[in-house]
């Protein structure tokens, strides 16, 4: 099997975790290449549900290497909590199956507090998870962040780095009349958590290079979705990292000569958590029905997801940005209840037709979707095991999506369980 990059083509929550878990059977390693514990993957194995935030989905498999790449911002306390919870549930996690990049910036409590403060300052809140992700990435870009490798430092060297970080954060806290953080206290906290993290730490770029030299198969696991990308998303309602496929090379530490298949994971309808434009949102019984049947609750935020019709304009743009080779269609069964189904094929604003998402947030907020209506099937697709099992109109719907997007559907997820997957085209597995 070739190396595979798995990305979400909407606003996250497309089902990437299940897809990566399924693919892990035929892979040697899985790399998380961006984001932090603000994203969540839900995986169901033999009716038992696992919720992952930082750990790659491969951690639930035996003899697979799980890698947290340098593009991830790492909350050491959240990571250890996640590891401890999995160990309680019988999942073996050790230095042989988990590797953490020495270059990962550290998410600290000061970042979470800053996240909350910045959200309060905004006129229009962006719906942050308050996990400290944005402020940590800001420290990284400003070259003051603490990184995992700093935990190897002697106490006096670490103190100087902490003091440099607090020069900024304590000034921020002063402006909000919040007590400053003592450098010595933060140093002690870091030295306390360090022995739990450091055994997993290696130069990930070298680990990945060695795997490629041995012709091992690597999956690069994206978090969130294309339109939460800091550059290409619906700004400012975005995350603080790049979420599209090219980020796998930067955030994983692999060079461009190692060609990869890009799988785009996409729901048969559209959802979004939090604030921001949503062009096909259904604030009616249709949206409510999608929400209830799809159990659309955020894994991390525990917030209700907004629901709407499939947006082919959004999907096509995401496919171009990531160079998607094939699609994984998820939650088709949520549409089983509808006699008619709509697909957005264009937008309209101020008399102008758009076949892409304009960058202007003002225009985005005023785009009107133009729909094409196709017949529904009113038959159960949940748990279908072959393509031929699907209702005729469900197959027509899938083919319509392929026709509009000009990319084939490789896989169809027919339920939350690991093996609830229909393979239409398996060439990427060879």
Curated annotation (Swiss-Prot):
One example GO MF annotation: GTP binding
Ranges in a coiled coil: none
Q: Which residues bind IMP?
A: 13-16, 38-41, 129, 143, 224, 239, 303
Taxonomically, the superkingdom here is Bacteria
Which Pfam families does this UniProt record tie to the protein?
Adenylsucc_synt
Q: What is its EC number?
A: 6.3.4.4
**SMART domains, from UniProt?**
Adenylsucc_synt
A cellular component term from Gene Ontology for this protein is: cytoplasm
Q: Which reaction does it catalyse?
A: IMP + L-aspartate + GTP = N(6)-(1,2-dicarboxyethyl)-AMP + GDP + phosphate + 2 H(+)
Pathway in which the depicted protein is active: Purine metabolism; AMP biosynthesis via de novo pathway; AMP from IMP: step 1/2
Which cysteines link up through disulfide bonds? none
List localization entries: Cytoplasm
Binding-site residues, GTP: 12-18, 40-42, 305, 331-333, 413-415
Q: Does the keyword Metal-binding apply?
A: yes
Query: What cofactor does its activity depend on?
Result: Mg(2+)
Provide the cofactor note recorded for this chain's UniProt entry.
Answer: Binds 1 Mg(2+) ion per subunit.
Tell me the residue numbers annotated for binding Mg(2+): 13, 40
| Biological process according to GO | 'de novo' AMP biosynthetic process; IMP metabolic process
| UniProt: substrate binding residues | 299-305
Keyword annotations of the record: Cytoplasm, GTP-binding, Ligase, Magnesium, Metal-binding, Nucleotide-binding, Purine biosynthesis
Family to which this protein belongs: Belongs to the adenylosuccinate synthetase family.
Tell me the HAMAP family matching this sequence. Adenylosucc_synth
Outline the subunit composition: Homodimer.
Task: List the NCBIfam families hit by this protein, alphabetically.
Answer: PRK01117.1 (NF002223), purA (TIGR00184)
According to its UniProt entry, the function of this protein is described as: Plays an important role in the de novo pathway of purine nucleotide biosynthesis. Catalyzes the first committed step in the biosynthesis of AMP from IMP.
Q: Please state what the protein is called.
A: Adenylosuccinate synthetase
